[in-house]
């Protein structure tokens, strides 16, 4: 019968080395280093996400103005809200990709909440009956967010998954549809709440879910 093991002596023992496992780890590390993948700076990726989200929304504004779908006076009247959405998108994009942007992520969430409330409160009674069903706005907002969604997912793979980081990236992406809604839709606050903001929430949730399921290229903070 074996004598009972002394816990103190067991804890002080040096664990046996598994040379085979160590060699496999070293081989995998050397293989990763041999790939020499180009490293993109997070600032460059943040600017790219800003361009893909807020930039795409502003491009839509220029196109709508050029084809006569939006008038100059309407654009000027909505300018404060548009500026707020662009600022929210920029702060969220920067905070999502900054390694030390925790405070900026919280600021981005706060700005998104304020912007959403402003979009609802700024809407008055519609000047004309709706010419299309409300779900058209939701679908169009989701559609215009596809490109910035892909850009955000690619950028987020450069670091390990963090829920708040993914949320603010989704809020940046969702602001694109919100910009479009302020330009192309004249319906009341109920419509904004139930269709415009719904699309913003949906695209944020989709980005968080997909980002969590993707394997990161790096485990940097």
Swiss-Prot record:
Record field: transmembrane: 56-76, 79-99, 107-127, 136-156, 166-186, 191-211
Induction comment: By light.
GO biological process: carotenoid biosynthetic process
Keyword Secreted in record: no
Name assigned to this protein: Carotenogenesis protein CarR
GO cellular component terms listed in the entry, alphabetical order: plasma membrane
Protein's job: Negative regulator of the carotenoid synthesis regulon. It is probably inactivated by protoporphyrin IX in the presence of blue light. Inactivation of CarR leads to loss of negative control over the carotenogenesis protein CarQ.
Membrane topology: Multi-pass membrane protein
Compartment list: Cell inner membrane
Species: Myxococcus xanthus
Gene name of the record: carR
Disulfide bridge partners, by residue number: none
This protein's UniProt keywords: Carotenoid biosynthesis, Cell inner membrane, Cell membrane, Membrane, Transmembrane, Transmembrane helix
